A protein has these predicted regions:
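Alpha-helical assembly-interface signal, strongest on the long, hydrophobic N-terminal helix that forms
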Residues: 2-78
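Short, conserved structural patches
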Residues: 56-193
């Protein structure tokens, strides 16, 4: 069989290059998506650590201060989203105050907002009277939750940069718990009425 002329094979190189380029672009997009997902998994833990540490020193009755804590925890000075972390915003950072049930079986219990002390100085008084009482804030917890449901901490669905069929991943709750510190009360402040 005689060899084919070079003119008829000119399109095959372009077709092979196009297929190889398509596979390469899909691979690069998958690597970028995986890198972003790992970034979010690690960053959300840092976000909750920052939120819990800041909330342990902020007045729990001051809504503006708590909004500032949420904003600072996602590395912002105003309301908005986490950089490269869509859909996570400051509204996704949930801060809870916990009490301990007893020394033997120290179980953490969330204190409802209605049962929180009237001020941080009163929390000190309540904790000195009964460190395991239901109204004594001993711990501060920060979590990443879906803000659509207020009573339950549902995981936030991951929002991909590139559309991959069958990719449905939920971000972790990324919970951090720290000891309650000043809760915004300066030393020597008298209890409030």
């Amino acid at each position: 069989m005689p060899p084919r002329p070079a003119q008829t094979q000119a399109g095959s190189t372009v077709a092979e290059f196009a297929v190889a380029l398509l596979i390469l672009i899909m691979f690069v997009c998958a690597v970028l998506e995986l890198a972003r997902l790992m970034y979010l998994y690690n960053t959300l833990q840092v976000v909750t650590q920052r939120a819990a540490a800041l909330a342990a020193n902020v007045d729990f009755k001051d809504a503006a201060a708590l909004d500032g804590v949420r904003q600072k925890s996602i590395f912002r000075d105003a309301a908005g989203g986490l950089i490269l972390g869509a859909p996570v915003t400051d509204a996704h950072v949930r801060i809870d105050y916990l009490s301990l049930s007893g020394p033997a079986a120290a179980m953490m219990t969330t204190i409802p907002n209605a049962s929180l002390p009237t001020c941080a100085a009163n929390n000190r008084v309540a904790c000195m009277a009964d460190p395991y009482g239901a109204g004594c804030i001993r711990l501060v917890r920060a979590r990443i939750c879906d803000p659509a449901v207020a009573g339950v901490c549902n995981r936030v669905p991951y929002q991909a940069l590139f559309a991959f069929p069958g990719l449905s991943v939920a971000l972790p709750r990324a919970t951090s718990i720290v000891s309650a510190e000043t809760l915004g009360a300066p030393p020597g402040k008298a209890p409030c009425p």
